[in-house]
């Protein structure tokens, strides 16, 4: 399926570049808009076919200001009173048409485990992210902030599970971290 989506996207981009090369007048706005819409439709199709997962997920040093507006942490070592802040870019999110808008809803579970897998803390349905838009978004981000104050120094694993309530799909990822 991913190969098909790549072929569709590649064909659309090839078509768009051929359109630009064939048009001697680069200021023809309608042709540019048509090419952009064709490429956008191919990206939406690829995103709709993608399994639920993360394009990007990492610890960041502050609450992100928006999509791709984050500061990655230099490492995964946290002070005892420092919150864990995770930036995510989910992909494969299901969007359903509700009237004039598309909507999605993700529910987050987390657990904190020892390196040997023992669950030390956690919560089901810890966070919920719902989004509505006039068009299916190409880019989507969330962030998660966890207060681990009081946890002793040591190595841990943050397990995050995201449930897509529209599709019924889930995905899990682990982020190792230390408290020093």
Language-model region placement:
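Bacterial N-terminal signal peptides
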Residues: 7-18
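Positively charged n-region of N-terminal signal peptides that target proteins for export
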Residues: 1-5
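Intrinsically disordered, low-complexity terminal regions enriched in Ser/Thr/Pro/Gly
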Residues: 23-180
């Amino acid at each position: 399926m991913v190969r098909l989506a790549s072929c569709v996207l590649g064909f659309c981009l090839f078509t768009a570049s051929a359109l630009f090369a064939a048009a001697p007048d680069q200021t023809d706005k309608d042709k540019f808009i048509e090419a952009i819409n064709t490429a956008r439709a191919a990206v939406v199709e690829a995103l709709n076919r993608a399994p639920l997962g993360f394009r990007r997920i990492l610890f960041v040093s502050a609450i992100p200001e928006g999509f791709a507006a984050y500061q990655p942490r230099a490492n995964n070592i946290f002070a005892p009173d420092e919150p864990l802040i995770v930036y995510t870019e989910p992909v494969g999110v299901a969007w359903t048409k509700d009237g004039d808008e598309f909507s999605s809803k993700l529910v987050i579970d987390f657990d904190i485990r020892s390196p040997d897998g023992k669950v030390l803390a956690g919560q089901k349905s810890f966070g919920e992210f719902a989004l509505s838009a006039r068009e299916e978004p190409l880019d989507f981000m969330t962030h998660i902030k966890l207060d681990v104050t009081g946890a002793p120094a040591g190595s841990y694993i943050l397990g995050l599970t995201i449930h897509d309530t529209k599709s019924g799909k889930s995905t899990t990822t682990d982020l190792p971290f230390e408290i020093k």
